[in-house]
Regions:
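Active-site loop/helix belt of alpha/beta enzymes
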Residues: 18-139, 143-147
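C-terminal accessory subdomain/extension
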Residues: 145-263
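Single conserved hydrophobic/aromatic residue that forms the stacking wall/gate
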Residues: 1-11
Length: 263
């Protein structure tokens, strides 16, 4: 038997409407509205929100987003016609917030813009000012001199063709730093670019510091962010590795310490 406290508990839930993402949610039909009305009558349940998700709001044409918005409003009308009033209605993701404020309704769901990043290259960047807030840093773990003929990292994909100074950075794909950056990406040390040499390992990768004077163990390494006049952006990392900025923001693993700064 349920206790008195359990009988008095109220579950607050939200109803998802599928208007075009074809992921999860009720379809926009009379039958779906009937089911939602039945849910609203269940004891100990309060429907506090109803929402949908834009599939193409980050595209140049906003017609698909407005088609979804119209479907969403139609579903709300069907539900309200059955006597169900849902207080919070929302559908705007980051692209919607920036470009179609008329769809913002009672609440919005900012995602990538919280990082100061753009949802896509098709979004009008003149509408809002964004500043990237996420950076990724490490320190030089080892420095060595290599002569011509040596091969660096797994598979020997980088061959030393002249005398080089190589620094090891203790970060790898185990931290979410993409292996796709092997022999393509670079980091910043003392405000200068240090190209990645060879494959990114699970926990380490190597960079060329031949032209950066006096690099030593413990020197700061910027993998994402600004150092002096140079900057590495999430978009650059994504383009080089065949990923996109959302993935890089999500793939940094829990073993990487987070430091949060106010203001």
């Amino acid at each position: 038997l349920l206790s008195r406290r359990q009988r008095q508990m109220c579950i607050r839930d939200s109803i998802k409407i599928d208007t075009g993402m074809c992921r999860i949610g009720f379809q926009v039909t009379e039958e779906s509205a009937d089911i939602i009305a039945q849910i609203a009558k269940l004891p100990n349940i309060m429907i506090e929100g109803i929402f949908t998700h834009f599939a193409r709001a980050d595209e140049l044409s906003k017609e698909p987003a407005f088609e979804q918005f119209d479907l969403f409003k139609r579903m709300i009308a069907l539900v309200e016609a059955r006597g169900v009033e849902i207080p919070i209605k929302h559908c705007s993701n980051s692209a919607g917030i920036v470009e179609i404020p008329e769809c913002n309704m009672d609440m919005v769901r900012a995602g990538i813009t919280l990082y100061g990043l753009w949802p896509s290259e098709e979004v009008d960047k003149s509408k809002i000012s964004l500043k990237p807030v996420m950076s990724l840093h490490s320190r030089v773990a080892y420095v060595k001199e290599l002569e011509p003929g040596r091969h660096i990292s797994y598979g020997g994909t980088f061959t030393v063709e002249h005398h080089m100074r190589i620094a090891t950075v203790p970060v790898g794909y185990g931290d979410g730093y993409s292996r796709g950056l092997s022999n393509k990406g670079w980091v910043l040390i003392k405000g200068k670019k240090a190209p990645i040499c060879g494959r990114v390992c699970m926990d380490q990768f190597m960079v060329d510091v031949t032209d950066i004077p006096d690099v030593k163990i413990g020197d700061a390494v910027t993998l994402l962010g600004k150092d002096g006049d140079e900057t590495i952006t999430m978009e650059q990392l994504g383009e080089l590795s065949g990923r996109f900025n959302y993935e890089f923001a999500c793939l940094i693993t829990p073993r990487v310490p987070r430091i949060y700064h106010k203001n």
